[in-house]
């Protein structure tokens, strides 16, 4: 009996070397787990089992009995629990055991998952194995690697998930735009932005109108100061006007006015080209009208100080001087200039403008006739034969000065006619037509000044030899 047990034990020790080739080619991880499990299994005491069960277990590993006996459940394995029975491995052809990462349970993994169940000859394989006996749970050598691999897999999964979300971003955006709450919020944002733009536009218009009003007030203050200086200069020297002082002040102020008016007309032309609203154009039109009123005030001051300086037109360019009428432009000529730029006009506007032009023409003729009569009377007074007498000189000079004062009245009437004509044109025309009217009149005088500059700067022919 002892000899048979010894032979069985030797036969049991040689069993691992007789494993088939498919099982020997298992992964190193499985071999390491096998060694660890074999070490743990060696800690068990064989005395815990009865002899009959032990003999039955040893007899079951006989080669002939394995081939003859029907395959049954292996309750007491002599090999490590993760190693399958060689006979069972040969019959199942491709079933491998793998240890889970925690080292507590085993799982059966078929090596050929594509094989159908009916081709396995009705063999039944246990999908679970009893857990390890109580004892110290030693970590496997490759558990750290498995944990690292699992963490890498999790990271890859998370990264792939992020990629999926980014690829689905357009779809999500489409769903968001269809959300009623989002649409309502976007509509509210657009409405708030529109109101903000309107407030900003109104604020800019208010600033622009305030700036123009401030400039007008500054001009009025400056004109009043100049008028006071001119009147003070005219009262010097026993009531005789001091011409050079008042004339120089007027020339400086007229040059400044031309510069300011050119800037305003440039802005008005830009507003017309940009198709601005009528409210904005109204500000520029009112500014242009205010500047013309300022110029007429300056002319009234210089007329009281030095009427001859205003009538001779030294303050104007040579080309402007040729078209001066009583110290300024003819209102009828200004209407003719602006009619070519303000078209189209309605029939009512044409009739009103035609009547205004005829009335201005009649007033011009009357004032021109009055001025001609005053000039002729002044010439006769100065050329009287009794002026050389001792008592007649001062009397004739007093009469001549009265005639000069009448000339001042005629010039003021001419300035009033110019001012009335411009104001009536502004009321007859629409805002855009009035803007074009002021632009046309300004361009007319600007071209006259440019013509004078070109004439003065023309190349002069060389003088011939002296006779």
Curated annotation (Swiss-Prot):
Segments forming domain bZIP: 179-223
PROSITE patterns recorded: BZIP (PS50217), BZIP_BASIC (PS00036), DOG1 (PS51806)
Gene Ontology biological process: defense response; DNA-templated transcription
Low complexity bias locations: 25-41
Record-level GO cellular component terms: nucleus
Renumbered residue ranges of the record's region Disordered: 1-42, 105-184
Region named Leucine-zipper: 207-221
Biased composition (Polar residues): 120-129, 158-168
SMART domains according to UniProt: BRLZ
Gene Ontology molecular function: DNA-binding transcription factor activity; sequence-specific DNA binding
Keywords from the UniProt entry: DNA-binding, Nucleus, Plant defense, Transcription, Transcription regulation
Cellular compartments annotated: Nucleus
Primary site of residence: nucleus
Region spans: Basic motif: 181-201
Composition skew (Basic and acidic residues), residue ranges: 1-10, 145-157, 169-182
Domain DOG1: 247-458
Function summary: Transcriptional regulator involved in defense response.
Family: Belongs to the bZIP family.
Subunit structure as annotated in this protein's UniProt entry: Interacts with NPR5/NH4, NH5.1 and NH5.2.
Protein name (database record): Transcription factor TGAL7
Species this chain originates from: Oryza sativa subsp. japonica
């Amino acid at each position: 009996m002892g000899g048979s047990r010894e032979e069985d034990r030797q036969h049991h020790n040689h069993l691992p070397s007789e494993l088939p080739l498919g099982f020997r080619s298992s992964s190193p991880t499985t071999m390491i787990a096998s060694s660890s499990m074999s070490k743990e299994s060696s800690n068990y005491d064989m005395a815990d089992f009865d002899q009959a069960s032990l003999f039955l277990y040893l007899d079951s590993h006989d080669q002939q009995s394995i081939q003859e006996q029907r395959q049954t459940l292996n309750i007491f394995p002599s090999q490590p629990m993760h190693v399958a029975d060689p006979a069972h491995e040969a019959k199942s052809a491709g079933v491998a055991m793998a240890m889970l990462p925690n080292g507590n349970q085993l799982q059966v993994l078929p090596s050929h998952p594509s094989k159908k169940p009916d081709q396995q000859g009705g063999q039944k394989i246990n999908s679970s194995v009893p857990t390890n006996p109580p004892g110290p749970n030693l970590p496997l050598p490759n558990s750290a690697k498995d944990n690292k691999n699992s963490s890498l897999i999790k990271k890859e999964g998370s990264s792939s998930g992020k990629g999926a979300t980014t690829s689905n971003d357009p779809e999500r955006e489409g769903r968001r735009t269809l959300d009623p709450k989002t649409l309502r919020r976007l509509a509210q944002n657009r409405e708030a932005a529109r109101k903000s733009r309107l407030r900003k536009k109104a604020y800019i218009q208010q600033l622009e109108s305030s700036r123009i009003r401030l400039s007008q007030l500054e001009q009025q203050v400056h004109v009043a100061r100049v008028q006071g200086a001119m009147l003070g200069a005219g009262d010097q020297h026993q009531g005789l006007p001091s011409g050079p002082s008042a004339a120089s002040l007027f020339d400086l102020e007229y040059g400044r006015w031309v510069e300011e008016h050119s800037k305003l007309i440039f802005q008005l032309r830009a507003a017309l080209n940009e198709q601005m609203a009528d409210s904005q154009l109204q500000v520029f039109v009112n500014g242009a009208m205010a500047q013309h009123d300022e110029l007429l005030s300056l002319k009234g001051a210089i007329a009281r100080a030095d009427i001859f300086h205003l009538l001779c037109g030294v303050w104007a360019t040579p080309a402007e001087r040729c078209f001066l009428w009583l110290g300024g432009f003819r209102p009828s000529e200004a209407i003719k200039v602006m009619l070519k730029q303000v078209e189209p006009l309605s029939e009512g506007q044409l009739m009103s403008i035609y009547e205004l032009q005829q009335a201005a023409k009649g007033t011009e003729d009357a004032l021109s006739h009055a001025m001609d009569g005053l000039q002729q009377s002044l010439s006769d007074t100065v050329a009287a034969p009794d002026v050389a007498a001792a008592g007649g000189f001062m009397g004739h000079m007093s009469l001549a000065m009265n005639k000069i004062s009448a000339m001042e009245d005629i010039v003021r009437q001419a300035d009033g006619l110019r001012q009335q004509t411009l104001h009536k044109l502004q009321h007859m025309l629409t805002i855009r037509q009035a803007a074009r009217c002021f632009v046309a009149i300004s361009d007319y005088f600007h071209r006259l000044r440019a013509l004078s500059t070109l004439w003065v700067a023309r190349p002069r022919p060389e003088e011939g030899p002296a006779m």
